[in-house]
């Protein structure tokens, strides 16, 4: 008898714990990618998943905020786009805010309501735009003047000084073969002979 009571108590405790599992918004993606860089779509698609273990769980609304400042997004402010509340179950939405600028990081989050109309906010994610058109190209192509069938691999070196402390930098590399990048004599990244782009 005591065993049956203990089993019954354990069963109801498990159901109670399962019912208290918080709703979470996860798997935030831009163009189906996790925190991508170099997006060239002026209208990227943003998606997410709602994790809610309750029976009959459903998303009843969503609101997306996008901004260049992550703190604004944390506070629910989107100067680039605030979709406003949309009564919809959609979890894939096309960006519909101000025109995105090239080479810019945009932070975003989604706020959704569950089946009880309680709101849950996602963690902040981001996407970075790429060149977004040849008119923004400022780089100069470098090469050894040989075609791709020439045997020895070229080695390119460029010395320069920034004149100030570098907070972050990005190198865009397109190679007809493999490459490794070094800065100040130190290899960048943990890959070995990265392919093409």
Predicted regions and their residues:
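Short beta-strand elements bearing conserved aromatic residues within extracellular beta-rich modules
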Residues: 46, 61-64, 179-181
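Recognizes extended acidic, P/S/T-rich segments that occur
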Residues: 50, 57-105, 111, 115-122, ...
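Beta-strand-rich ligand-recognition modules
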Residues: 95-99, 183-197
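Aromatic-lined ligand-binding clefts that engage carbohydrates, nucleic acids, or primary amines
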Residues: 160-163, 167-183
